[in-house]
Amino acid sequence: MVREIEKQQGAAFKLKKGQRLKVIDPRGEQVSDMVLFNAHDTREKISSGKTLDFEETILITKGHFLWSNRSNKMMEILEDTNGRNDFLLAPCSPETFKIMYNNSGYHPSCFENLHTNLKSFGIEPDDIPTAFNIFMNVQFKEDGKLSVDPPLSKAGDYVLLEAQMDLIVGLTACSAEDSNNGSFKPIHYEILG
């Protein structure tokens, strides 16, 4: 059954070892932030540093694993029809919009959506790690300068992942304008198996 995360919203759910998660961009150019926690000990969580280190690339896609802070495999990426994801940048937060966009008012954020949906699992704001940003198109120049460009994902693109342990998953439809080419759209997901 395909479920929808409305624009600028989030969801959290459990995934059993061996189950598959399909994250779908139904309209194109929409990022989805994903965080993972060990369902039996939430101190173990997805780690950008360990993943980039062990996979020896900053371009995480089909054939790669997402690793935990305890050096355990959490998910394997089985399929990725877009091929461009980010694992460098933190989930957008209220502070992101104040510091980077000079936004003085309230703005929805992935960080808030992750925390709001994960708090029923006992996960606190300080527990939220760097997210695996599905469909996010971060470019980097030779001098190290980063830029967030419009996603390359088209309507119907998806990433299929398989759980390597029992997981708690946090997932969003990203709230940052620059990450989504200036518009906000839903994200679909499906749990298989």
Residue ranges and their predicted role:
Residues 1-193:
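Acidic, Ser/Thr/Pro
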